[in-house]
Amino acid sequence: MRTSETHPIEVGWLPDLWPGRVGLTFAPGKHQPGGLSGAWVRDLELDLKRLRTVHGAQHLVCLLEDHELVKLAIADLAQRAKSNGLEFHRLPIQDGSIPAELGAVRALAQRICSWAAARQTAVIHCMGGLGRAGTIGGCVLRTAGLDAPATFEALREARGVKCPETNEQRLYVQQFTAVAAAH
C-alpha cells in the first residue's frame, strides 16, 4: 500500500524554459484501493503541504472530474488546497480522453506559461499524473515553443514513457499549436 509517508508525493518537472517551474504529478491525497500500481491510501493534508513546502507549488491545476474527486476521497481538494496556500484551478477532462474545449486549454496553457514566466510554480495533476496531466503539460510546452518531438521527450523525462497515455492524447499534443492557431 502506498501512503504519503511511505511514498511522499513527487513532481516530474518540465524543462526549465522559464524562471518558474511547471510539473506533473498524481492526485494528492487519493484513496484508490484497486489502482493499477497497487493500493493508494494517501493523506491529503501531508501531500498538499509537501507540494507547497518541498516543491514550492503556488498553483495546483486539477484535471479530475467531480465523480473522480468523490471516488478518490478528495472531494474537498479545492478548499484544502486553498487552506494550504495554493491557488486552485480546474479543467475537468474525462479519464483517458482529451479536453473538450480547445479555447479553455489554450487559455490554461497560456496562464501556466505566464505564471512560470513570473517565477511562479505550477503543478498539474490528474489521477495518475500521466494521461491528462501529460496532455496539458504537453500543451504548455507546445505553447512555449517546443516542437512535438522535444515535447514528447520532455514529458518522458518528467513522467515516463506513457506520458501522455493514449494515442489520442499524443495526437492532441502533436497538433495543438496548429489547431489552436486556426481557431
Summary of predicted features, one role per range:
Residues 126:
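Short cysteine clusters
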Residues 1-123, 136-183:
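Cys-dependent protein tyrosine phosphatase-like superfamily
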Residues 133:
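Ser/Thr-glycine-rich phosphate-binding loops at phosphate-binding pockets of nucleotides
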Residues 129:
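Conserved G/P- and acidic residue-centered "switch" motifs that form tight phosphate/ATP-binding loops
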